[in-house]
């Protein structure tokens, strides 16, 4: 069911199966998300399956998510197949050609299944979306292709869970209903004994067993639904206040999660000048539509506020599309972003001495390197190692002496190249990079916070270097513990063994 927590349940099951000694991999034939990742082979895939692969303790592969749709507008998306963009399409265009992608999905799944003991397949939305059931290869259509038994995940937190379970099952075809071997009720608060009568009644009415009731779990694992939860929970302003500008088509917001782990730091997502307030650092994140979101910054008054902050000494940091916005201008010779097909030039914010030109081929690559000679408040970053990945269609020109980092591709022994930029005159407080994950390296986020504290004449003696990877492993184990405690794993293994 849509927004029921399928991604986290899948990650939890992957972790349990891995702990039990099985080779397990996640799979989602089609994902729609702005958060994406670049594999070791340079292929682009959805981050939800990256999280699930991490839970399974394996390297992410584009086989786990052969089709990714990245929205570029309210009615169109960039279509990525097997890690490469094949074009931008309106919804009608995509559904008209969707049937041609079924062989790609089948091939990806079969290849993955041949390498692993168990493949955990996540559906998308609800299996009862009868209006788009034709040519389905994501939900029950995918289950048929894989000959896989199905567990239905239902969210009780929003209310009406029993009607939702019953209605979903009744809208399935008879042969599809027979494939559903169990129901998981997710996000429960309170005493499960109160549910017992309802559980028995729904089992009697549908003939499908309830295999467990998962509680509302406080676990810090990135999830497709977690951004709305982060934003709706208004962060109190702490000793260090970091404001991420929530542009309309923001992507890869997970770049900043590491700051939430540091004591005394508030990470806020803001959409207006009023919400922006007086932060210590402003981050402009990546976006699927750089020029469109830059225009939004202008129309909303946010650009003027950011410029005022930068001129008064507040740190401004741009990542990917946010980095492009900080420059002098953005040229789109093919009119790709605005959909006109006509060449256009958009003035940038003018905070960095860079100019960006969009090209047709997207750069997708994992990379490693180090910070160069960093000027100003973040000088302590100089020489620190960094790693991450790039996903962008722009080529950015800048004076090499103003470079922020030096990087090279991890897997093809490419040449070391200057990357990113910084202002080297005036306040020395504006920085930009294409590298997603730039803050995740050991000690980088802590150095940034220490510098922001020093600017205020303060220090935090008990700050510890954060091992982000180890922290995430701990969270996956907490999730697995909850799965074991609240689901009937014996029954789930029996379902796996019996198949369909």
Short names for language-model regions:
Residues 325:
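Conserved catalytic-site region of short-chain dehydrogenase/reductase
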Residues 1-315, 332, 360-362, 372-500:
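Flexible phosphate-sensing "switch/lid" loops adjacent to ATP/NTP-binding sites
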Residues 320:
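Catalytic nucleophile serine of serine hydrolases
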Residues 223-226, 329-345, 354-368:
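Conserved phosphate-handling catalytic cores of large alpha/beta enzymes
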């Amino acid at each position: 069911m849509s927004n029921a927590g399928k991604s986290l349940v899948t990650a939890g099951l992957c972790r349990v199966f891995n702990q039990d000694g099985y080779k397990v991999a996640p799979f989602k034939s089609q994902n729609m998300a702005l958060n994406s990742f670049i594999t070791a082979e340079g292929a682009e895939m959805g981050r939800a399956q990256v999280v699930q692969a991490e839970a399974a303790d394996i390297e992410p592969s584009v086989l786990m998510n052969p089709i990714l749709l990245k929205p570029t507008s309210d009615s169109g998306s960039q279509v990525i197949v097997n890690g490469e963009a094949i074009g931008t399409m309106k919804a009608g265009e995509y559904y008209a050609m969707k049937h041609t992608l079924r062989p790609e999905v089948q091939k990806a799944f079969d290849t993955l299944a041949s390498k692993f003991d168990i493949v955990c397949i996540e559906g998308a939305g609800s299996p009862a979306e009868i209006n788009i059931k034709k040519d389905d290869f994501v939900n029950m259509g995918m289950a048929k292709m894989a000959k896989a038994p199905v567990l239905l995940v239902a969210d009780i937190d929003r209310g009406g869970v029993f009607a939702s379970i019953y209605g979903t099952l009744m809208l399935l075809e008879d042969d599809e209903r027979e494939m559903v071997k169990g129901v998981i009720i997710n996000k429960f608060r309170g005493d499960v004994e109160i549910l017992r009568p309802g559980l028995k009644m729904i089992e009697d009415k549908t003939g499908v067993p309830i295999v467990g009731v998962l509680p509302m779990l406080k676990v810090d694992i990135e999830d497709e639904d977690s951004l709305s939860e982060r934003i709706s929970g208004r962060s109190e302003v702490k000793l260090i206040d970091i404001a991420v500008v929530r542009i309309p088509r923001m992507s890869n917001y997970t770049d900043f999660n590491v700051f939430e782990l540091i004591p005394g730091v508030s990470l806020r997502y803001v959409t207006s000048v009023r919400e922006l307030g007086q932060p210590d650092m402003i981050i402009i994140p990546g976006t699927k539509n750089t020029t469109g979101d830059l225009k939004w910054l202008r129309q909303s008054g946010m650009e003027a506020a950011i410029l005022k902050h930068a001129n008064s000494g507040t740190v401004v940091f741009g990542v990917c599309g946010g980095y492009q916005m900080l420059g002098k201008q953005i040229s789109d010779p093919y009119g790709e972003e605005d959909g006109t097909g006509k060449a256009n030039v958009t003035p940038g914010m003018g905070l960095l001495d860079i100019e960006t030109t969009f090209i047709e081929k997207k750069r997708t690559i994992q990379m490693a390197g180090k910070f160069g000679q960093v000027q100003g408040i973040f000088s302590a970053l100089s020489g620190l190692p960094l790693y991450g990945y790039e996903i962008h269609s722009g080529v950015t020109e800048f004076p090499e002496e103003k470079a922020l980092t030096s990087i090279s591709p991890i897997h093809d022994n490419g040449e070391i190249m200057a990357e990113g930029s910084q202002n080297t005159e005036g306040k020395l407080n504006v920085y930009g990079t294409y590298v997603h994950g730039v803050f995740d390296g050991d000690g980088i986020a802590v150095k940034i916070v220490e510098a922001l504290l020093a600017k205020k004449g303060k220090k935090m003696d008990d700050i510890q270097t954060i091992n982000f990877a180890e922290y995430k492993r701990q969270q996956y184990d907490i999730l697995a513990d909850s799965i074991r405690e609240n689901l009937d794993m014996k029954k789930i293994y029996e379902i796996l063994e019996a198949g369909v």
